[in-house]
Amino acid sequence: MLTANKLLPQGHGLAPVLLKRAATVELDWDVRQKSRFAATDSTGRELGVFLPRGTVVRGGDVLVAEDGSMVRVVAAPQAVLRITHCTQHGSPFDLTRAAYHLGNRHVPIELRPDHLQIEPDHVLADMLRAMHLIVTEQQAPFEPEGGAYAAGGHGHGHDHPHHDHGHDHAHAHAHGTEACDHEHSHDHDCGHHHDHGQDYGHAHPHSLAR
């Protein structure tokens, strides 16, 4: 197993040609928020990653292995809930309210100009629909905010220029619609009952203990 214990945020200082040639490794958020984990890169090499505690790995970062080789991290698509405001019965300000309430619950949130993303949670989904918001399930990379005082991070809490997903979140599974269907009978669920019964636990056998 090849050991990697150095991280270059967004490949800082590396020539673009080196980044293109580097092997890649796809990691979801559950793994990337850990400082120690195992993974397999695009060439089939087994990696043991040992970073300083508190380090958060973002898509576009580069891991440097003990032999000097580099591995570029790709934020893997994963199950997320995409939250948008209801144009018929709400306003864009509803997203601000949603972010406030989710933040009070210490929920990891990815903030985008026109929507929010969180990890699947049927209780939170019901709460958000009750606030006139549209909640749809999809597969997409997840890059939540790191927090203004996040320790050990490397400044990804607010710049996020690296969302080169290349698919504009085209992986929506059509579990919801973009129009609010309720008749304003005060149930305010926008007609989206997404109780699919999934167990949203994510087992990642590659993760090592912190």
Curated annotation (Swiss-Prot):
One of its GO terms (biological process) is protein folding. Gene3D superfamilies: Urease metallochaperone UreE, N-terminal domain, UreE, C-terminal domain. SUPFAM superfamilies: Urease metallochaperone UreE, C-terminal domain, Urease metallochaperone UreE, N-terminal domain. Residues 144-210 are annotated as: Disordered. It holds the Pfam family UreE_C. It is found in: Cytoplasm. Keywords: Chaperone, Cytoplasm, Nickel, Nickel insertion. Residues 156-202 have a biased composition (Basic and acidic residues). Its main location: cytoplasm. GO terms for molecular function: nickel cation binding; unfolded protein binding. The keyword Transmembrane does not apply. GO terms for cellular component: cytoplasm. The keyword Isomerase does not apply. Belongs to the UreE family. Involved in urease metallocenter assembly. Binds nickel. Probably functions as a nickel donor during metallocenter assembly. HAMAP family: UreE. This is Urease accessory protein UreE. It comes from Paracidovorax citrulli (strain AAC00-1).
